[in-house]
Amino acid sequence: MPQTRDPTLDTLLDLDGQALVVDPAGRHWVRFVVTRVPVTPDKPHGLDYSLTLHGPDGERLAGFDNAHPVARQKRGEPQDHRHRLRTVKAYDYQDAATLLGDFWATVDALLRERGIIP
C-alpha cells in the first residue's frame, strides 16, 4: 500500500528560512530551517529540520530537530529530538502538524514561565 503524503507538510516547508519575533518587546524569536532530503535511516521522514526559540542574547532556549545524535543514545545515531533549556529528549515525530503544534506549545510554555507573555 503506498504511503499517504502528509497534507500539512507544505505548511512546514513554507516556513523554511523564516524568523519571527514572538514577544511584545521583540527580544525573543523563532527560526525555522526545514528542507526535503532523501529518506535515510538518519532522516526517515525525508526532512532535515530545526525549529528553534531564541532569547535576547541569541541563545537557543528550545528547539526540535533531527540534525545530530542525542547524547544519551546507546549507539549515538541521529534521531528526532527536542531541546528545552539544557535538557535534550527524544521526540516521536508523527507529522508536520504535530511537530508545529508541539513546537508552539513549548514556545508558549517557556515564554509564560519567564513572564514574557501572560
PLM features per residue range, with description:
Residues 47-49, 75-94:
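Short, surface-exposed secondary-structure junctions/capping segments
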